[in-house]
């Protein structure tokens, strides 16, 4: 099956950094994990987990909008947090973008993410 790489205009460019935001195979879009960078590649909310989570979800929503979809089309998510104490803040922001029934989501804690 052929794949198509897509660079949405609504989020920061990934040119030269070794990954793409979106790949399409058949009728399915695969979207890379989103981080707290604005469209110009600037970090949003340094030290503010709620601002960073909001930007990541805003990026995801912008990509889906550009592809003609919506957050309601998501069938599986994976969430990475660097600190378990951030879970309540993460959920507060997530609940601004999603409501019950939520898509399946695997949550994992890791040492660091793509932006420090």
Sequence positions of predicted segments:
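N-terminal presequence-like segments and the immediate start of the first folded domain
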Residues: 1-58, 62-75, 81-116
């Amino acid at each position: 099956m052929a794949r198509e790489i897509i660079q949405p205009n609504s989020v920061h460019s990934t040119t030269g950094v070794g990954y793409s935001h979106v790949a399409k195979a058949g009728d399915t879009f695969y979207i890379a994990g989103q981080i707290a960078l604005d469209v110009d590649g600037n970090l949003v909310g340094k030290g503010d987990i709620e601002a960073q989570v909001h930007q990541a979800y805003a990026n995801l929503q912008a990509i889906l909008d550009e592809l003609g979809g919506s957050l309601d089309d998501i069938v599986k998510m994976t969430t990475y947090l660097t600190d378990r104490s951030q879970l309540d803040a993460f959920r507060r922001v997530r609940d601004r973008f999603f409501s019950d029934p939520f898509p399946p989501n695997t949550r994992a804690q890791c040492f660091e993410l793509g932006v420090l």
